[in-house]
Amino acid sequence: MTAKGQMLQDPFLNALRKEHVPVSIYLVNGIKLQGQVESFDQYVVLLRNTSVTQMVYKHAISTIVPARSVNLQHENRPQAAPASTLVQVETVQQPAE
């Protein structure tokens, strides 16, 4: 996996883990798993539900759907500066003398 791919996956999975967000994980074969992300590494996600912890290989995952939105904060990356404000200036031509 490229470093760029990890820049998206790791903050997303880490936010799900830290905030204990319930997730639905859809596998490429259509099976739906539900639980909370307990841990993850480059190749697997540990998904915990009430009765068991499952090791799910990332190559088998199609989609991860959180039950609510999560705040993604990329580590080692400063927050974006506030967008600059655009001001529309109207110019009036003075009559020629």
Curated annotation (Swiss-Prot):
- Residue span of region Disordered: 75-97
* Keyword terms, alphabetized: RNA-binding, Stress response
GO CC terms in record? cytosol
Give GO MF terms, alphabetically.
RNA binding
Keyword Transcription regulation found: no
Q: Where is the composition biased (Polar residues)?
A: 85-97
UniProt-listed GO biological process terms: regulation of DNA-templated transcription; regulation of RNA stability; regulation of translation, ncRNA-mediated
InterPro entries, per this entry? Hfq, LSM_dom_sf, Sm
Q: Subunit structure of this entry?
A: Homohexamer.
What this chain does, per the entry, is described as: RNA chaperone that binds small regulatory RNA (sRNAs) and mRNAs to facilitate mRNA translational regulation in response to envelope stress, environmental stress and changes in metabolite concentrations. Also binds with high specificity to tRNAs.
Q: Which family, according to the similarity comment?
A: Belongs to the Hfq family.
PANTHER family in UniProt: RNA-BINDING PROTEIN HFQ
Q: What is this protein called?
A: RNA-binding protein Hfq
**Record organism:** Neisseria meningitidis serogroup C / serotype 2a (strain ATCC 700532 / DSM 15464 / FAM18)
Q: What is the lineage of its organism?
A: Bacteria, Pseudomonadati, Pseudomonadota, Betaproteobacteria, Neisseriales
In the UniProt record, what gene is named as encoding this protein? hfq
